[in-house]
Amino acid sequence: MARRKTTKRKVKKNVPFGIAHIHTTFNNTIVTITDANGNAITWSSAGALGFKGSRKSTPFAAQLAAEAVAKAAMEHGMAKIEVFIAGPGPGREAAVRSLQAAGLEITAIKDVTAVPHNGCRPPKSPRG
């Protein structure tokens, strides 16, 4: 008889304060909530919610991803968050608004988008 695999159950941590990292690209939006040390508590993305193709890059998809993360974070006892936004995508404002509407108190919003000091050549711009 085969042995049953023992899996770790998700432990409910009591974390009152956290950091929300919103990473928006032109193709997707990823929202991760960490504790003050940077250990991930929960995450979600537009693709993980079932959006495919060009629908992943919409503000609505970013909104739903942020809502899912906020609900999971509040189950861990989180009430206040600091928001770090990175990337040029369309879901930036929608994700922040959604976190606030879900009931999390936002203490600070910081843009941490990496700006090159003339590093790599960017992709060619679409002509239309």
From Swiss-Prot:
One of its GO terms (cellular component) is ribonucleoprotein complex. The keyword Ribonucleoprotein applies. GO terms for molecular function: rRNA binding; structural constituent of ribosome. Pfam families: Ribosomal_S11. SUPFAM superfamilies: Translational machinery components. Keywords: Ribonucleoprotein, Ribosomal protein, RNA-binding, rRNA-binding. InterPro entries: Ribosomal_uS11 (IPR001971), Ribosomal_uS11_bac-type (IPR019981), Ribosomal_uS11_sf (IPR036967). Transmembrane segments: none annotated. GO terms for biological process: translation. Located on the platform of the 30S subunit, it bridges several disparate RNA helices of the 16S rRNA. Forms part of the Shine-Dalgarno cleft in the 70S ribosome. Part of the 30S ribosomal subunit. Interacts with proteins S7 and S18. Binds to IF-3. Belongs to the universal ribosomal protein uS11 family. This is Small ribosomal subunit protein uS11.
